C-alpha cells in the first residue's frame, strides 16, 4: 500500500497524441476499458515524474510520453475559444484505505505551452467519508491556477486542502489548452 493511503483511482483513459506518442496509463492494474479505468492504481501513483519534454524516452523503450497520462480537449468550440462549450473537466476519483485528514494534494503537470499543453486552469476537489457512491460534502475546494506564460517546464501544482476529511476525493481538472497532461499525484494527509 502507498504511504498516502491511496488504494485506487478511477478516471478516463489517456489518449493518443499522434502516431508516436501514446499518453495512456499503461501500468493500470484495475479494470481497463477502451475509454475508462476503475478500481486500480497505475502511472499516476508510481513515483515517477515525467520529463518536461513529453516525447523523451528515458529508457529507450520506444514509448515516447510513457511517464505522462494525457487528454485532448478536441471540441471545435474549444479551438474557437468558446469556454462554455469545452470538453467537460477530467474527473479523477481517488479512494483511500480509511478516512484521512488532508493537508495538500500535488499534481505533477506539464506546461509545454508551445505544444498546446498547459497545466489545468482550475481544480475542484470534493470530499466524502464514504465510498464514491455515497455523495460528497457540500463545500468543495476550488483552486484557480495562475497561467504561466513564461516557463515551459513541468511542475508540481500544489493545492492546499487543510482540515478536509474524507475516504474518497474527487478531482475535476479543467482544461486550459488543447492538452492536459499529468504524470504523478501525491496526497499529504494524516489519520
Q: Where is each model-derived feature located?
A:
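Disordered, acidic Ser/Thr/Pro-rich linker "stalks" and the adjacent N-terminal cap
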Residues: 1-98, 110
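Contiguous beta-strand segments within globular domains
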Residues: 101-106
Amino acid at each position: 500500500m502507498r504511504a498516502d493511503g491511496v488504494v485506487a483511482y478511477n478516471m478516463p483513459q489517456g489518449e493518443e497524441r499522434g502516431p508516436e506518442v501514446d499518453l495512456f496509463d499503461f501500468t493500470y492494474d484495475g479494470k481497463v476499458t477502451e475509454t475508462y479505468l476503475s478500481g486500480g492504481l497505475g502511472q499516476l501513483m508510481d513515483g515517477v515524474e515525467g520529463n518536461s519534454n513529453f516525447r523523451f524516452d528515458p529508457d529507450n523503450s520506444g514509448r515516447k510520453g510513457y511517464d505522462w497520462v494525457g487528454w485532448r480537449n478536441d471540441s471545435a468550440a474549444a479551438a474557437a475559444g468558446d469556454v462554455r462549450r469545452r470538453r467537460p473537466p477530467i474527473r479523477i476519483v481517488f479512494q483511500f484505505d480509511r478516512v484521512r485528514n488532508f493537508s495538500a494534494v500535488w499534481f505533477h503537470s506539464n506546461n509545454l505551452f508551445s505544444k498546446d499543453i498547459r497545466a489545468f486552469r482550475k481544480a475542484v476537489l470534493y470530499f466524502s467519508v464514504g465510498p464514491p457512491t455515497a455523495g460528497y460534502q457540500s463545500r468543495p475546494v476550488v483552486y484557480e491556477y495562475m497561467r504561466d506564460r513564461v516557463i515551459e517546464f513541468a511542475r508540481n501544482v500544489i493545492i492546499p486542502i487543510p482540515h478536509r476529511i474524507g475516504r474518497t476525493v474527487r478531482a475535476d481538472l479543467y482544461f486550459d489548452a488543447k492538452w492536459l497532461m499529468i504524470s504523478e499525484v501525491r496526497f499529504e494527509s494524516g489519520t
